[in-house]
C-alpha cells in the first residue's frame, strides 16, 4: 500500500514522505490515527506544499532565535533580588524559571517563555551567580549568568 505520511513516524519517515507499507499496517494503524493518507496526485501536491511551508517556517524560526540569542548575550548577566533567610545566604523560597524570565524582561531583554529556561538544578536556593541555559531552537541555545542577590 502506498501512503503519504502526515506525521513523523519512527523508523518509517517524516511528514510528506511517500512510503510503501504492508496493507494491514496502513489500514489498521497509520490511516485510523491520521498519520498517513492514501497516495494520489492531489495528495502528493498537498504534501509538497505542506513540506515547503514547514521548511520556510523553520528558517524563520531559526532567524528569530538568533535575534533573541543576540539580545540575551547583550545583557551579559541579570541581577535577581530575593529575600534571604538571615545572613546564611539561603533563600526563603527558590528561584524558578519564571523568576528568571521576569528578571530578563525587567533588564530590558526579550519576552521569553519559561519552558525554554533550563536551570542546572530544579530551583536555585542560594545567593550567588548561577548559569542558566535557554533552548531557543533545537539548534540554538544561549547561556546567561543570573546573579541572585539579597534584597535590601
UniProtKB/Swiss-Prot annotation:
SUPFAM superfamilies: L9 N-domain-like (SSF55658), Ribosomal protein L9 C-domain (SSF55653). It comes from the Bacteria. Belongs to the bacterial ribosomal protein bL9 family. One of its GO terms (molecular function) is structural constituent of ribosome. One of its GO terms (cellular component) is ribonucleoprotein complex. Keywords: Ribonucleoprotein, Ribosomal protein, RNA-binding, rRNA-binding. Pfam families: Ribosomal_L9_C (PF03948), Ribosomal_L9_N (PF01281). Gene3D superfamilies: Ribosomal protein L9, C-terminal domain, Ribosomal protein L9, N-terminal domain. GO terms for biological process: translation. This is Large ribosomal subunit protein bL9. The keyword rRNA-binding applies. Disulfide bonds: none annotated. Binds to the 23S rRNA.
